[in-house]
Swiss-Prot record:
Membrane topology label: Multi-pass membrane protein
Organism expressing this protein natively: Mus musculus (Mouse)
Enzyme Commission numbers on file: 7.6.2.-
Activity control, per UniProt: Cholesterol efflux is increased by extracellularly applied taurocholate.
This protein's name: ABC-type organic anion transporter ABCA8A
A biological process from GO: cholesterol efflux
List of residues binding ATP 2: G1322, H1323, N1324, G1325, A1326, G1327, K1328, S1329
Function: Mediates cholesterol and taurocholate efflux. Through the interaction with ABCA1 potentiates the cholesterol efflux to lipid-free APOA1, in turn regulates high-density lipoprotein cholesterol levels.
InterPro entries found in the cross-reference section: AAA+_ATPase, ABC2_TM, ABC_transporter-like_ATP-bd, ABC_transporter-like_CS, ABCA, P-loop_NTPase, R2_ABCA1-4-like
Keyword Iron found: no
Source domain of life: Eukaryota
Localization per Swiss-Prot or TrEMBL: Cell membrane; Basolateral cell membrane
Length: 1620
């Protein structure tokens, strides 16, 4: 065992290197990640280029002059209502000097005023009186008053234009607002009090209070820039969230079992993205400083703010990846949190929140970052330009600390929830668990201590358990007691394990067997630490699985091979092994040696530099096993370690485990009973979570086996009844198990072995019976399993007590007869559709298929909803904007806007009102009048202040003159936009209070509704965005054919008889209406919301429907053409969407350029299909506009361009048809629309002579040649493969040298007769897959020909039945939907299809799964579905490629029975390929074995066993160890060439050469004598299995010259595909 020491630094470095390689090799994701980041940075630069920043220097006070200096003759006044008081007031206003010559009109009401203004005048001021003291000054929007309500803290309130200084509040003074306000206020005072103050009001003087230096930002671009700052790291958080979530879900638990520390996992991701964040922050800070978005704050402060924000988002992504299990949901939540919390920070920008709440919300890092940015802007706005260039960053430093705190806080929450959430549903983990001292320890000991105290040695008293040999007592390595595991899903409790008790011994290989869902994987997961038991306890080498410290020891001792493959696809084989070696704690200097050892052990040297994603499924499985054996562990926990491996690789794994059995513990699960039989010393059967039995193969076969299988190969002259009579004569309770042409099989009871010598002697001495050869084999573990499962379904409590179940077995003849009857009912020829009726049915089936797929395509639906939502949102926002623009508003002008009330605490930005008395007299009466207005005053009674030098005040009133005649100077802080109108009201009310203390004047400002004069501009702006949106949609809804091609569903449809035109038009029949509906829905929404004057007519709608429909068809079929061309690459819907967008964008730009409009418009409509929507819409809009102005006859010809999309559609249909004919897959039927007929490929002679062939292969070649030339169609086989050869072009190693050809098959000839199932077997690379592809038509043969159903041209079948190795299914469709669609494709009528579906579902027990989506099905049920699809419609030729892979034995039996029932005694033939020899033995009438591209042998299974089987297997079980040596001496005397195999002492195993055993009668006679002499418990003698024959023949592939012509990688991967 290699020394292992867990090292966090080593693990972190290994994982970091893995992440770096991930970035390097997943180039597309890395490119997009950095592209999006770069685009956001470019957006920052763009906004800053458009952004205006004002660095305003300090300025002393500015005198605006007297109020009566206003002089403007361009406006008029309209007032309402008309009352004597309002008339007197306005008459007095008309006498003011600057009102001379101005019109003042009276209006009875506001509606009349608005109408009057809209009809006659453009520059009007409205005066609306509420009462004698309250009125509203109403202006046209944007005229004479500012358009905003108030300055914001960060916006510029003054601008410098050379020597001219302009401040926003001066607009009130300069354009007449305060002049008119002062005149009206003076008139109100005079009318209501009979005291004139007109002179005082007209002498008002305005001044700016001293303007401090400031840096001001400008408006919307600031908000946009801040928003982009918030989402600057979103591309990084998206990819880190997705990567971490996927890796945690798939790999982290498995790596933790190997010893991975949590800190190493998070550090590896954090360090990588920390560096990326550092670089992005550096660039962002540089941009901010270069463009001077922030002036006064130093580089490091800004850098720190951005950097800690980025790190906090990384921590937030980690936290969300723990809380949420799906990567899509994690990405979405992180992005929404970033946007929402960051946008909430705008409340800090506009001071909507109290400071305390701002700091509380800073626990959300996006808000804290936004608060920091706001603080930077405020520093620029408030701090003098000559101050320290670092500013006053105390608040910013506090925010940076909060961001640092947020990052640490999120990390702590990540660690906390990672410990709590996975264990929350088990025992004592609670949310206050973090308060305990053992927070980071997994503690399950509360339920173990009692069990340990009461522990006793467990004895199996049931006779279902074979007693353990004495030599293993005290070698208990794994002890399991009362183990229970419950799963809770949707409030439903499922017991995976139920009180399971078991010991696993050192020095033994133990197999866990059981049906799917029995609990095998759950048990192994509990033992490996991947999940926690509900109750019970486990010790491994005296280490308690419940203790954290013991778990670490266990991880060092254990090698785990889980059911799913463990590897990173973007790493090579060698890199994966190095990574996991370091995770396991193998010392750095030993890693390379250990990796080399594993590569050699598993024969993976040729694949060590291949990326895992390019490996076959079997090679990936082998790599997972290699990772498990890294470090030479003492305990192997293997969950189906050889699933998917070819026989050679499987035997290599078996030999590896056998060689290391002595000092180690091997516990594995498997679905292959033969594997358990050959490899395991002890087999443990689990059913529904309970332990059923355990023992050696011999024990189990004797107790539950059905006996020996006697197989006889017969000549044509044999008489079946005579042979059966002879067998019954010797063994009356024997049973005939199988009968077919040339073959008989019997079951002989185990307890009748004493009768075997006489039976075999009579068989050997009776040549007249027509027996060519015979063989005998012991019952298989599969039969034991089926009998156990049959018993467990009857009685869960007791196995071994019901004799009738043992006799009947789990798979009774009645069940087979039932399956045969159900399937045979389908063999009658149902009437199939043809011609256009079939084409239309296929079209409808594909349309339905496309609808069902879109229903579950989340991304496409999101895109459609998003596009529709954006379009409708744009229309809604345009209407809201129009409504706002056309609506009026009214803003109050009151002192509380800027000034405190008496006794109020200081509250920025409110201040006291400064009163400066420069009259030299007391002004107590005026002061008292001001105090009546509830204003906090600060009075300079002696006039010592200037009043305009202190910018801390919002406003000041400076009184001069004498006590009888005041002169007022109004000084305003330029930051307060409405200061002048407010101070005018304060002065007016001060004067009014002298005469009428209870009265109060109130002035408001408002605007008139704006006229709707932007209709055309609105339409064009909407239209531009709408066209660009629509251009992005087709790639997302019309490129699913790429998915169909890559998962081979398209090939499955083609081989099922689908016409190419029906496939494409069927998809279009659904997609075109969806796309049209999307376009027209936005059109209709626009029309519905448009103003009455812009409503379109029915004729307009007709024209738009015409060109929209044509555009949809043309662009959808253009997308089909693109999909066909790029079907072998990635789908890249987003990239093609971007291309469509760019083409549409530039096309629109050319169309909208006035100079080129007429030329570009017509050219682009005619030549650029994506531009036709925009072009036709713009053309239609222009035709409509021109028709309203002037009639131009030549414009009538422009309507012909609306037919351009239909022309494009026809062109793309023709292109698609030509591509299908030239480059498409071979069709099975004549396409009535595309006019494509099944191709008849040219036949080339095979250049290679078949020298040195086996005689059976030569005979098959002759028979095939005769069948090929036979004129009797009825006698022709279902499949004829004659002289097939396939060559592939190899890659050039040098541009000078010619590339070597790779020969996949050389000269293959065989046929499949009607009613026959032929098995095609071979090692990986032998040529099986290529042969299948040539038969299906997927690959053209280089020489030779294939005939199906008797003819290669005129009478080809309309479709083939094909069950591919990979499940060519749509994951979101249900089983019934699959069956209905394929039935329609094959031409079955609906009534016939429903009957067939029900019967096939009954035959294969699929009734419960008919409504289940495929993605929820087990692998075994998926294989059943693929098989049913292959035989649906009664095809005459069926190809089955490993049909029972992934099934448990029960499912395999169902499948095999269905295959036998489907083809037995019918006119159909089947070709089956498999790696599972038991499957071939169960269903094949004949077997052909391929070696190195050649047919090595062919014949019945018994014939091949007799011809090529070299050995028999003898197993004997002794009662006492003392018998071993004498018995061994006797066996060696009787069988001199016997080879003893390694087993534990009570079980003796020998391999006997065939010549030592023949004749069988003598062999059994000798063994019966031995049994009596040595009092053996039991023995068995069995012929070589087909697997052993296959292995012997396949070894020739390594010895011949086949590899000389092939690249070394051919040994590890399937033969090259033609399309590659």
């Amino acid at each position: 065992m290699v020394k292992r020491e867990i090292n966090v630094c080593q693990q972190t470095w290994a994982l970091l290197c893995k992440n770096l390689l991930r970035k390097k090799r997943l180039k597309r994701d890395t490119f997009l990640e950095f592209l999006y980041t770069a685009l956001i940075l470019l957006s920052l630069i763009l906004f800053l280029q458009l952004h205006e920043v004002y660095d305003f220097s300090s300025l002393p006070d500015v005198d605006l002059g007297r109020i009566d200096s206003f002089n403007d003759s361009t406006f008029m006044i309209v007032y309402t209502p008309i009352t004597p008081t309002t008339q007197r007031i306005m008459d007095r206003v008309s006498l003011v000097s600057y009102m001379t010559g101005r019109k003042i009109l009276a209006s009875p009401n506001e509606e009349n005023m608005t109408e009057l203004i809209s009809m006659r005048f453009s520059d009007v001021v409205g005066v609306i009186f509420t009462n004698a003291y309250s009125y509203n000054l109403k202006f046209i929007k944007g005229a004479r008053i500012p358009t905003i309500k108030e300055h914001q803290d960060h916006t510029a309130h003054c601008h410098s234009y050379g020597e001219i200084i302009y401040c926003g509040l001066s607009e009130f003074w300069r354009d007449g607002f305060v002049a008119l306000q002062a005149a009206i206020n003076a008139a109100i005072i005079e009318v209501t009090t009979n005291h004139s103050v007109m002179e005082e009001m007209m002498s008002l003087t305005g001044k700016y209070i001293k303007i401090d230096s400031f840096v001001g930002q400008e408006g919307t671009t600031t908000d946009c820039f801040l928003f982009f700052c918030i989402i600057r790291f979103s591309p990084l958080t998206y990819y880190i969230s997705a990567g971490v979530t996927r890796e945690r879900k798939k790999m982290k638990g498995l790596m933790a079992v190997m010893g991975l520390r949590d800190s190493a996992f998070w550090l590896s991701w954090g360090l990588l993205y920390g560096v990326i964040v550092f670089v992005v922050t550096l660039l962002s800070t540089t941009i901010v400083k270069l463009v001077q978005f922030v002036f006064l704050t130093g580089f490091m402060v800004i850098f720190s703010l951005f950097f800690f924000y980025g790190l906090s988002l990384i921590s937030l992504s980690f936290l969300m990846s723990v809380l949420l299990k799906k990567s899509f949901l994690t990405d979405l939540v992180v992005f929404l949190l970033t946007v929402s919390c960051g946008s909430l920070g705008f409340t800090a920008l506009y001071r909507y929140l109290p400071v305390s709440l701002e700091w509380l919300l800073s626990l959300l890092s996006p808000f804290a970052f936004m608060l920091g940015m706001v603080q930077l802007l405020r520093l620029d706005y408030d701090v003098n330009s000559n101050a320290d260039p670092m500013g006053n960053p105390n608040e910013v430093i506090g925010t940076i600390f909060m961001l640092f705190f947020d990052g640490v806080f999120y990390l702590l929450l990540t660690f906390y929830f990672e410990k709590v959430l996975p264990s929350k549903s088990f025992h004592d983990k609670t949310y206050w668990h973090a308060c305990k001292s053992h927070f980071f320890l997994i503690d399950y000991s509360f339920y173990i201590r009692t069990a340990l105290d009461n522990e006793t040695d467990y004895e199996f008293s049931d006779d279902s358990f074979e007693p353990v040999s004495m030599e293993f007592h005290g070698k208990e390595a794994i002890r399991i007691r009362n183990l229970t595991k419950d799963y809770i899903q949707k409030s439903k409790r499922t017991e995976a394990l139920k009180d399971l008790t078991l010991d696993v011994y050192k020095g033994q290989i133990t197999a866990i067997l059981g049906h799917s869902g029995a609990g095998k994987s759950t048990l192994l997961n509990v033992l490996s630490g991947l999940c926690v038991p509900t109750k019970g306890w486990v010790t491994i080498h005296n280490n308690k699985l419940s203790e954290m410290t013991d778990l670490e020891n266990i991880s060092k001792l254990t090698g785990v091979c889980p059911q799913c493959n463990v590897q990173f696809d973007f790493l090579t084989v060698r890199e994966n092994l190095r990574l996991f070696a370091k995770i396991k704690g193998i010392q750095a200097h030993e890693v390379d040696n250990e990796v080399q050892r594993v590569l050699l052990e598993l024969d993976m040297k040729n694949t060590q530099n291949i990326l895992v994603q390019n490996l076959s499924g079997g090679q990936k499985r082998k790599l997972t096993f290699g990772i498990a054996i890294l470090g030479d562990p003492q305990i192997f926990l293997l969950d189906e370690p050889t699933a998917g491996l070819d026989p050679f690789s499987r035997h290599r794994v078996w030999n590896f485990l056998k060689e290391r059995r002595a000092d180690r513990v091997v516990l594995f699960s498997t679905q292959f009973m033969d594997e358990a039989d050959i490899l395991a010393d002890r087999k443990v059967f689990i059913s529904k979570g309970k332990l059923k039995c355990a023992g050696s193969s011999l024990f189990l076969k004797k107790k539950w086996g059905i006996g020996y299988h006697l197989s006889l190969q017969l000549s044509e002259t044999c008489v079946h009844e005579r042979i059966t009579s002879l067998v019954k004569q010797h063994i009356p309770d024997s049973k005939l198990s199988a009968e077919s042409e040339g073959k008989l099989s019997y079951i002989l009871p185990l307890e009748r072995t004493n009768k075997f010598p006489d039976l075999y002697r009579d068989l050997e001495r009776s040549p007249d019976l027509g027996i060519e050869n015979y063989g005998v084999s012991i019952t298989t573990l599969t039969e034991v399993f089926l009998k156990l499962e049959g018993k467990s379904s009857i009685d869960q409590s007791d196995i071994g007590m019901t004799e009738d179940v043992q006799a009947g077995g789990a798979r009774s003849p009645e069940r087979f007869a039932e399956v045969e009857q159900l399937v045979s009912l389908l063999n009658g020829r149902c009437k199939m559709k043809g011609g256009m009726a079939l084409w239309w049915q296929q079209l409808c089936a594909v349309t339905r298929l496309r609808f069902l797929k879109l229903k579950h395509e989340r991304k496409s639906i999101v895109i459609l909803i998003l596009v529709l939502g954006i379009g409708l949102l744009h229309i809604l926002s345009a209407n809201i904007y129009r409504m706002v623009r056309q609506s009026d508003y009214c803003w109050e002008l009151a002192p509380h806007m800027y000034f405190l009330t008496p006794g109020q605490q200081p509250q920025p930005p409110l201040t006291n009102l400064l009163i400066v008395n420069k009259t030299g007299a007391k002004i107590d009466d005026f002061i008292h009048s001001l105090e009546q207005q509830n204003i906090a005053l600060e009075v300079d009674a002696f006039g010592t202040r200037n009043g305009t030098e202190d910018s801390q005040y919002n406003g000041a009133i400076i009184l001069s003159g004498d006590e009888k005649n005041y002169n007022f100077t109004l000084a305003c802080n330029t930051k307060r936009l409405n200061c002048f109108p407010v101070l005018v009201d304060i002065v007016s009310n001060g004067l009014l209070g002298l005469f009428a203390p209870s009265a109060h004047i109130q002035t408001d400002r408002s605007t008139f509704p704006e006229e709707n004069d932007h209709r055309k501009f609105d339409y064009l702006a909407y239209f531009f965005l709408w066209v660009l949106l629509m251009a992005c949609v087709p790639p997302y809804i019309s490129m699913t054919s790429i998915d169909d091609y890559k998962n081979r569903a398209q090939f499955q449809l083609w081989i099922s008889g689908l016409s190419p035109s029906a496939y494409w038009f069927g998809q279009a029949l659904f997609e075109v209406p969806v796309y049209c509906a999307l376009i027209l829905s936005i059109f209709i929404a626009f029309y519905a919301s448009a103003p009455p004057e812009s409503k379109f007519t029915v004729g307009d709608l007709f024209i738009q429907i015409l060109y929209v429909g044509g555009y949809a068809m043309s662009v959808i079929f253009m997308t089909y053409v693109i999909s066909f061309i790029y079907r072998k690459g990635r789908k890249n819907s987003g990239l093609w969407s971007l291309c469509f967008y760019i083409v549409s964008f530039f096309s629109m730009c050319f169309m909208l350029i006035d100079y080129f409009r007429d030329i570009s418009l017509f050219v682009l409509i005619a030549l650029v299909p994506p531009a036709t929507l925009g072009g036709c819409t713009l053309l239609h809009f222009e035709n409509r506009e021109f028709s309203e102005i002037i009639f131009e006859p030549e414009r009538e010809y422009s309507y012909l361009f609306f037919l351009a999309p239909l022309l494009h559609f026809a062109i793309f249909v023709v292109i698609l048809r030509c591509m299908e004919r030239k480059f498409g897959m071979k069709t099975m039927r004549t396409d009535p629309v595309f006019r494509i007929s099944p191709r008849s490929d040219r036949v080339f002679n095979n250049p290679e002579d078949p020298d040195g062939e086996d005689e059976d292969v030569s005979q098959e070649r002759v028979w095939t040649a005769n069948a090929l030339t036979s004129a009797d169609f009825q006698e022709k086989p279902a499949i004829i493969a004659s002289c097939l050869r396939k060559e592939y072009k190899g890659k050039k190693k040098c541009f000078v040298l010619k590339s070597k050809k790779k020969i996949a098959t050389r000269n293959i000839s065989f046929c499949v007769r009607k009613g026959e199932v032929v098995g095609l077997l071979g090692h990986n690379g032998a040529g099986k897959s290529t042969s299948i592809k040539m038969i299906t038509g997927e690959t053209k043969p280089s020489a030779g020909q294939v005939l199906l159903k008797g003819s290669s041209t005129g009478d080809t079948p309309g479709f083939l039945g094909y069950c591919p190795q990979e499940n060519a299914l749509w994951l979101n469709l249900t089983v019934r939907e699959h069956l209905e669609i394929f039935a329609a494709i094959k031409g079955m009528r609906k009534s016939d299809a429903n009957v067939a579906i029900e019967r096939l579902a009954d035959a294969l027990k699929l009734q419960d799964q008919l409504k289940s989506p495929v993605k929820t099905l087990s692998e075994g049920v998926k294989r059943k579905l693929c098989f049913v699809l292959s035989i649906l419609g009664n095809p005459s030729v069926v190809l089955l490629d490993e049909p029972s892979t992934g099934m448990d034995p029960e499912g395999q039996q169902q499948m095999w029975q269905a295959i036998q029932a489907t083809f037995s005694n019918t006119e159909r033939g089947a070709l089956l390929t498999t790696h599972y020899m038991a499957e071939a033995e169960a269903v094949c009438d004949r077997v052909a074995i391929m070696v190195s591209g050649r047919l090595r042998c062919i014949g019945s299974i018994q014939h091949l066993k007799s011809k090529f089987g070299k050995e028999y297997l003898l197993e004997m079980k002794v009662k006492t160890p003392s018998q071993v040596e004498p018995l061994n001496t006797e066996i060696m005397r009787l069988f001199p060439q016997a080879a003893r195999q390694e087993r534990y002492s009570s079980l003796m195993v020998y391999k006997l050469p065939r010549e030592d055993v023949q004749p069988l009668s003598q062999a059994f006679f000798k063994l019966e004598t031995v049994k009596q002499s040595f009092d053996l418990e039991e023995y068995s003698l069995s012929q070589s299995t087909l697997e052993q024959v296959f292995l012997e023949l396949s070894k020739e592939q390594e010895l011949d010259g086949f590899e000389e012509e092939l690249d070394p990688s051919v040994k590890w991967k399937l033969l090259p595909q033609e399309e590659a």
